[in-house]
């Protein structure tokens, strides 16, 4: 049977067998099996230093991070550099690279973390978008339903039958009034995901999550007065206010996508 592990998996298996599970032996054995070659020009100095003993590389890494925490933190465990925009972001804020928890936030969040928010956030907002739970966004935006066209015509076929009964009544009364319908579910997924990165405590807390979702409407609408009222009303909740302010770029991006 053909080995599906590939060259890397085969190499790691051989190294693990030879090292007997010892981390120092595994490191030395893997170093010997790696082909010699020049490292990239922007690689940190500790990357191309020979391994004399099991602790030399960790000591070099510790010393290098003290000298240049941003440079040392920009390399993955596999030895490859991270994306350029991440590098630039960390260089602008070197203090963030010094803490592992902050550095982890530079990379995409695992799907299971966002699963807690998807049901109460994205699915609920997407359903209200189709069922008209807020003001219509047909004026001045392309990609939405044109005037006079029933929203049910835009629904996928498997959603038309169970949700058809909601359209027999007045759409705004089908669900409680709350969030607007100016954003598509795909945009909402990006918004909530970005918020989860920057302010996870906002969406992971049951108390602040409901307040945050209820106040997304003035953020993505033209109701300037309501938006100012929303900021004043959340002055006692700093995390919620900061989370809403962090979403302003998404409002501009959504406007450009539909213009």
Swiss-Prot record:
Region (Disordered): 1-44, 131-154
Native source species: Homo sapiens
UniProt entry tagged with the keyword Nucleus: yes
Bias (Basic and acidic residues) ranges: 138-152
InterPro entries: FAM220A (IPR040355), SIPAR (IPR029155)
Protein name: Protein FAM220A
Pfam family, one: FAM220
Quaternary data: Interacts with transcriptional activator STAT3; the interaction occurs in both the nucleus and the cytoplasm, is enhanced by IL6 and promotes STAT3 dephosphorylation, leading to negative regulation of STAT3 transcriptional activator activity. Can interact with both unphosphorylated and phosphorylated STAT3 but interacts preferentially with phosphorylated STAT3 in the nucleus. Interacts with protein phosphatase PTPN2/TC45; this promotes interaction of PTPN2 with STAT3, leading to dephosphorylation of STAT3 by PTPN2.
Gene symbol of the encoding locus: FAM220A
């Amino acid at each position: 049977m053909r080995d599906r592990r590939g060259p890397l998996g085969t190499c790691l298996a051989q190294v693990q067998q030879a090292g007997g599970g010892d981390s120092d032996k595994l490191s030395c054995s893997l170093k010997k099996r790696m082909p010699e070659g020049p490292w990239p020009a922007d690689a940190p100095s500790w990357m191309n230093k020979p391994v004399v003993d099991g602790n030399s590389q960790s000591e070099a890494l510790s010393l290098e991070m003290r000298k240049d925490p941003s440079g040392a933190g920009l390399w993955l465990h596999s030895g490859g550099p991270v994306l350029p925009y991440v590098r630039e972001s960390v260089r602008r804020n070197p203090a963030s690279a010094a803490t592992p928890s902050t550095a982890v936030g530079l990379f995409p969040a695992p799907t299971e973390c966002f699963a807690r928010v998807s049901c109460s956030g994205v699915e609920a907002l997407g359903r209200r978008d189709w069922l008209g739970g807020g003001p219509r966004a047909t004026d001045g935006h392309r990609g939405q339903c044109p005037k006079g066209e029933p929203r049910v015509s835009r629904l996928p076929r498997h959603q038309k039958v169970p949700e058809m009964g909601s359209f027999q009544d007045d759409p705004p009364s089908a669900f409680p009034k709350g969030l607007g319908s100016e954003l598509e579910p795909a945009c909402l997924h990006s918004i909530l995901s970005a918020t989860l990165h920057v302010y996870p405590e906002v969406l992971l807390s049951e108390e602040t999550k409901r307040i945050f979702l209820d106040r997304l409407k003035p953020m993505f609408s033209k109701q300037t007065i309501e938006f100012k009222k929303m900021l004043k009303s959340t002055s006692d909740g700093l995390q919620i206010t900061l989370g809403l302010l962090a979403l302003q770029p998404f409002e501009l991006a959504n406007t450009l996508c539909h213009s």
